[in-house]
């Protein structure tokens, strides 16, 4: 996986100081960012030129204390063929020697008005999401009440139709059929559509529909955190389904576990409403309100009261 410098330039809203169109095609292969402090002093052991080189106030102030010759020599050594881009934070002035070294070594120079630490965070967050390894999952990803719900189930059970009904009820489609999921960190999953399927839903008997064209921009979303999975399966009278909500079921994707709810599909059952309820119930649990525990406590108290009466 890699990200082109031109994509970083657009997404993080940076200013291009030096770099041709060809140089903007350079690829960034790591989300790690280098703050070249010791390198300014001439110590290049363990230098990582393949990383983005971010220069903030500390690095810049030290650089400006050098003589013009030393400044030029240090920058020439810092700018390597594998260096994708050098970024200057805080709208700091670009010294002539840096422009000269960039021209000699053909290195892209970008600048931002943002503070160094905040800029570093923005770049890392963007690159982490773009460079993370993707896992393709069959299903429908919806944004329901601000929560990412992954709808799965056997082929033909009605996942896309349920997604369409949820869109009509005011929720947003993220992806249909193929959901590309990646771990943004050790605890968080994010999902997005395959580019060719963006905003599209396949409905049997109707064909492919463009949700954005039919229902507007408010009906779609480019990406979403995946917080809960819903698995649709055919109703089986011989199978026991969870009725209290205390059965623990999880789905693991890319090393991250999320809760999963299994919903039996039966003629006449409004699945979209059930999924809405599952999403709201998940949010309530996250806020510390668990209806199952409340019911169990009430039941325990009732049993205790009955035992006292019989005694």
Curated annotation (Swiss-Prot):
> What other remark does the UniProt record contain for this protein?
Both phosphorylation and phosphorolysis are carried out by the same active site and suggest a common mechanism for both reactions.
According to its UniProt entry, one GO biological process term is: regulation of carbohydrate metabolic process
Segments of this protein annotated with the region Important for the catalytic mechanism of both phosphorylation and dephosphorylation: 201-210
Q: Quick one: which residues bind ATP?
A: 153-160
Q: Which gene encodes it?
A: hprK
- Give binding positions for Mg(2+): 160, 202
Q: Which UniProt keywords apply?
A: ATP-binding, Carbohydrate metabolism, Kinase, Magnesium, Metal-binding, Multifunctional enzyme, Nucleotide-binding, Serine/threonine-protein kinase, Transferase
Primary enzyme class: transferase
Protein's name in the database: HPr kinase/phosphorylase
Molecular function in Gene Ontology: ATP binding; magnesium ion binding; phosphorelay sensor kinase activity; protein serine/threonine kinase activity; protein serine/threonine/tyrosine kinase activity
* Catalysed transformations (reactions): [HPr protein]-L-serine + ATP = [HPr protein]-O-phospho-L-serine + ADP + H(+); [HPr protein]-O-phospho-L-serine + phosphate + H(+) = [HPr protein]-L-serine + diphosphate
Q: Which InterPro entries match?
A: HPr(Ser)_kin/Pase, Hpr_kin/Pase_C, Hpr_kin/Pase_Hpr_N, P-loop_NTPase, Ser_kin/Pase_Hpr-like_N_sf
Copy the domain comment. Answer: The Walker A ATP-binding motif also binds Pi and PPi.
Subunit and partners: Homohexamer.
Sequence segments annotated as region (Important for the catalytic mechanism of dephosphorylation): 264-269
Q: Which cofactor does it need?
A: Mg(2+)
Q: Does the keyword Acetylation apply?
A: no
The EC number(s) given in the record are 2.7.11.-, 2.7.4.-
Q: Which family does it belong to?
A: Belongs to the HPrK/P family.
Q: Which NCBIfam families match?
A: hpr-ser
Explain the purpose of this protein: Catalyzes the ATP- as well as the pyrophosphate-dependent phosphorylation of a specific serine residue in HPr, a phosphocarrier protein of the phosphoenolpyruvate-dependent sugar phosphotransferase system (PTS). HprK/P also catalyzes the pyrophosphate-producing, inorganic phosphate-dependent dephosphorylation (phosphorolysis) of seryl-phosphorylated HPr (P-Ser-HPr).
List the active site: 138, 159, 177, 243
